[in-house]
From Swiss-Prot:
One of its GO terms (cellular component) is cytosol. Forms oxaloacetate, a four-carbon dicarboxylic acid source for the tricarboxylic acid cycle. The active site is at H137, K569. This is Phosphoenolpyruvate carboxylase. It comes from Streptomyces coelicolor (strain ATCC BAA-471 / A3(2) / M145).
């Protein structure tokens, strides 16, 4: 699936350039209309100078008034917003043409499935569940107010018109560009989690009413063509969210915030369901005179009418001979009652409202069965099946919320509870990990409460326990689909998982004796050490009878989350990717040994440095046997609009992920290569990873690197941009890489065009393999190993985005002389990495194999470079003012933040 890093058009480039030029001309007219011709002249002058004479450009910008500088940045940024949306529209057009000529990706996947074992294919389809999980950080740098207007511009661009309508269309485009210019793209205040939730809900609402139904309808048809029926109760596509549930490092996410976000989601989810049911009511005019109905339908209708006095006598009279329409009216009333119940906080009343999506689906199934048995099969298995599958995909909650908390928070709360009991000879905090694991496993089997309610714990402990109580309350009020997974970040051992399980038991979420586990406990492995210990952690869990029982109660499925960001930040991209690949193999082997199905949750970022890149390729590059029909993948805030703003691209992205998961699960069940080849490649990757890791650690362990990083990038401005509700640094961390979260780490390098996390160390790794005389193995890996080819492709694309010519300007202007040796190290590794990657690909220049993407980057640079020059000039001014102890200039800060937004738009990502 395309991400912010790769979603570039491959359509006819001349048509694309013509449309970009058309919008660029309209933007020029907007600038003249709004600000006068002088601004347009200055924009063109700056663009020319940055290409021809960098020093003259820098000199000009150093003396530019702040207000003019801000307008300049806004002009270039607006150009990028318009160029981006034009590329998306053309990509959508191209996909439509390809679909018409060759069929969609699901059709091509269905053709491949004819080679699959029929029984295994049926099992895969039964278990099929692809879940994109929306996260908030780093939040889309463009505000929703801007995105709404860009969406309108996209719709106008995609409207086929004849010459007589062209003038009117251009007027509408110009109006919207004027509105974009007059809209403040900077957030005035940092968004609350509820604001972030509204941003995700905006996209989920659109998906609900469009792309998802198309994908599910196509999937059903293509599977039937491949000889497999998609079972009625299978949910092949669902959605998840972390917004409102991710409290790791975000003090703003309290139990109350979680509750408020769930209420907000349900308001939208129920409204979307009402819209679909209203549409159904319009269709279901089947008369009892011409089409019969089952006894089940008539009995359920009678029961509904008795319990729902709100149904108007008029409806009962008008629809007396239309039982299907009257049943749809009852379903609608139950949805309205559910909405009112949630708003008022009153208890669920069976038969009057819905407790979860399953009850809604059950009502619709009664209608579907009756239609099938009374000559209405075409509609039952067509439009109605589409409605049912779409409602099952989103549920009344729109997206299932994951809850995430740091492992230490659970131990902090449990320590107080165990120490209060005084049963152990040492304090909980002093216990070795192995001892603590046994203690917690024993406690999980026990039925006693650890503490009275409310528990005698401090404020942080109370907050942690409150989260579990909120989860329990949510399941009671909203139904079982609202929260399914509790994720433990920085999970280093089995005791971290047991700790969360014991607290869940305390809250009544798990009872092994009564035979229920209402949530699953999910370890998040996010550092290189944790990834290396993946099999040991899972083995320690599944070997324990109490935990194995918990997994059995969750359908014999164990979810494990793999974190790409932190492993890359601390180990470098090569070691991160390789250790994640190996961890998946080891997790697969342990899970299979215990008869457990593994659900991997990939915590991938939007950028290559945080695990990003095309999702479709990444899924197909997974080790054999690791996919068994289920996968979860994070959709980071900053790539959501790239993937889902344009309906055609939303459909394509979902189709790509579903198709890849289906293909990998059904066909990649055994090694594609011989054991000898795999052993040879593994040994080669060990050489590459070790050398790359050494080079990367040499860079990050340079004592001057933290200061160089802050000097050569605008990372200190990240907090002021109000991108998201989560702080960019860990509390009390100061100037250190350990204290900086992975997102601002990537953000800073990206803004200064160095993009170190996306490629650093790769050249040293590949060189080490060549020097070991393994050139032929390298070629073999690139030609035959999907994992390695995907890795090299992502690195090559990041190298093409990296621009050390621009980075040199940052360093020359902003970095003290005594720190410039760090940039020399970066330049040397960059030169080596480009050379080594070209050796592997056989190209003479980066992206020779993708000339359209290469050309796109070249065109973008002409508009991106001026923003970078402006950013350097403004950073210099701000730092000089700070050194002189002058009061911060709000206009300067604003202009600087506009450059940050502009570079993000130009490179199509924040972090």
């Amino acid at each position: 699936m395309s991400s912010a890093d790769d979603q570039t058009t491959t359509t006819t480039s001349s048509e694309l350039r013509a449309d970009i030029r058309r919008l660029g001309d309209l933007l020029g007219e907007t600038l003249v209309r709004q600000e006068g011709p002088e601004l347009l002249e200055l924009v063109e002058k700056v663009r020319r100078l940055t290409r021809e004479d960098g020093e003259a450009a820098a000199e000009l910008l150093r003396g530019t008034e702040l207000e003019t500088a801000a307008k300049l940045v806004r002009a270039f940024s607006t150009y990028f917003h318009l160029a981006n949306v034009t590329e998306q529209v053309h990509r959508g057009r191209e996909l439509g043409a390809k679909r018409a000529a060759e069929g969609g990706l699901l059709a091509r996947t269905a053709d491949r499935l004819k080679d699959a074992d029929p029984e295994h294919l049926r099992e895969t389809v039964r278990n099929l569940n692809v879940r994109p999980v929306f996260t908030a950080h780093p939040t889309e740098a463009a505000r929703r107010s801007v995105l709404n207007k860009l969406r309108r511009i996209a719709a106008l661009l995609d409207t086929p018109v004849n010459e007589s309508d062209r003038r009117r269309l251009d007027t509408r485009l110009a109006e919207n560009i004027d509105l974009v210019w007059q809209t403040d793209e900077l957030r005035v205040v940092r968004p609350e989690p509820a604001d972030e939730a509204r941003n995700a809900i905006y996209y989920l609402d659109e998906l609900h009413l469009g792309a998802v139904g198309d994908v599910l309808e196509d999937l059903t048809a293509e599977l039937e063509r491949a000889g497999v029926k998609l079972p009625d109760d299978t949910r092949p596509l669902t959605f998840g969210t972390w917004i409102g549930g991710d409290r790791d490092g975000n003090p703003n996410v309290t139990p109350q915030v979680t509750w408020d976000v769930l209420i907000l989601q349900h308001e939208h989810g129920i409204n979307d369901a009402l819209e679909m049911i209203d549409e159904l009511r319009g269709f279901l005019s089947n008369s009892i005179r011409y089409a019969g109905a089952t006894e089940e339908l008539l009995a359920s209708l009678q029961a509904d009418l008795e319990r729902l006095p709100e149904i108007s006598p008029r409806y009962k009279r008008l629809n007396a001979e239309e039982p299907y329409r009257l049943k749809a009216t009852c379903i609608r009333q139950k949805l309205e009652n559910t909405k009112q119940r949630l708003a008022k906080g009153t208890p669920h009343e069976d038969g009057r409202d819905y407790l979860g999506t399953a009850q809604l689906i059950d009502d619709l199934r009664i209608v579907q069965t009756s239609l099938r048995e009374h000559r209405g099969g075409l509609f039952a298995d067509g439009r109605l099946a589409r409605t049912i599958r779409t409602l099952a995909a989103f549920g009344l909650q729109l997206a299932t919320m994951d809850v995430r908390e740091h492992a230490d928070a659970h131990h902090h709360a449990l320590g107080q509870l165990f120490d209060r009991l005084g049963e152990e000879s040492w304090r909980y905090a002093d216990m070795p990990r192995e001892y603590r694991t046994k203690l917690l496993a024993k406690e999980l089997r026990s039925r006693r409460p650890l503490a009275p309610s409310p528990a005698p714990v401090d404020a942080p402990g109370e907050k942690t326990l409150g989260v579990f109580q909120t989860v329990r309350r949510a399941l009671e009020v909203f139904g079982p689909e609202v929260i399914e997974s509790y994720i433990i970040s920085m999970c280093q051992g089995a005791d971290d998982v047991f700790a969360a399980a014991v607290l869940a038991r305390e809250a009544g979420l798990i009872d092994l004796h009564a035979g229920w586990a209402k949530i699953g406990i999910v370890p998040l492995l996010e550092t290189t050490d944790e990834l290396k210990a993946a099999d040991t952690i899972l083995e320690d869990l599944l070997a324990d009878p109490s935990y194995r029982r918990l997994v059995a109660l969750r359908g014999d499925v164990q979810e494990v989350m793999l974190g790409y960001s932190d492993s890359s930040k601390f180990g470098g991209i090569t070691t991160s990717q390789w250790e994640i690949h190996r961890a998946q193999r080891r997790l697969r082997d342990v899970a299979h040994r215990y008869g457990v199905r593994l659900r991997l949750f990939h915590g991938r970022g939007g950028t290559v440095g945080r695990g990003g890149g095309p999702t479709h390729d990444a899924i197909l590059a997974q080790p054999w046997g690791t996919l068994e029909g289920e996968i979860k993948v994070t959709e980071q805030g900053e790539v959501i609009s790239d993937k889902y703003l344009i309906p055609a691209l939303a459909r394509e992205n979902l189709e790509l992920t579903v198709a890849a998961t289906l293909q990998a699960s059904a066909l990649h069940t055994a090694p594609r290569q011989s054991d000898e080849a795999l052993a040879r490649w593994d040994a080669a990757m060990d050489v590459v990873s070790d050398a790359a890791h050494t080079a990367y650690r040499h860079l990050v362990e340079d004592p001057d690197l933290p200061t160089y990083f802050l000097a050569s990038t605008p990372v200190d401005q990240l907090a002021d941009l109000h991108l998201g509700s989560r702080p960019s640094r860990r509390p009390g961390s100061g100037v250190s890489l350990d204290g900086l979260r992975a997102i601002p780490w990537v953000f800073g390098w990206t803004q200064s065009r160095q993009i170190v996390p996306g490629w650093y160390g790769v050249g040293s790794g590949l060189k080490a393999l060549r020097e070991a005389g393994l050139d032929t193995v390298l070629d073999e890996m690139h030609q035959q190993w999907h994992f390695f080819r995907n890795f090299i492709s992502n690195v090559e694309m990041t190298l093409a985005k990296t621009d050390l010519r621009i980075a040199q300007h940052y360093v020359d202007t902003l970095v003290p002389d005594e720190l410039k040796h760090v940039f020399d190290t970066i330049k040397a590794e960059h030169e080596l990495t480009v050379a080594e990657v070209l050796r592997v690909t056989g190209e003479s220049e980066l992206l020779d194999a993708d000339p359209v993407l290469k050309q796109t980057f070249t065109i973008r640079d002409a508009y991106l470079d001026p923003i970078s020059y402006l950013q350097v000039a403004l950073l210099g001014r701000q730092r000089e003012a700070a050194a002189a102890n002058e009061d911060p200039d709000p206009l300067l800060a604003r202009a600087l933040l506009l450059t940050v937004n502009g570079v993000a738009a130009g490179l199509r990502n924040t972090g």
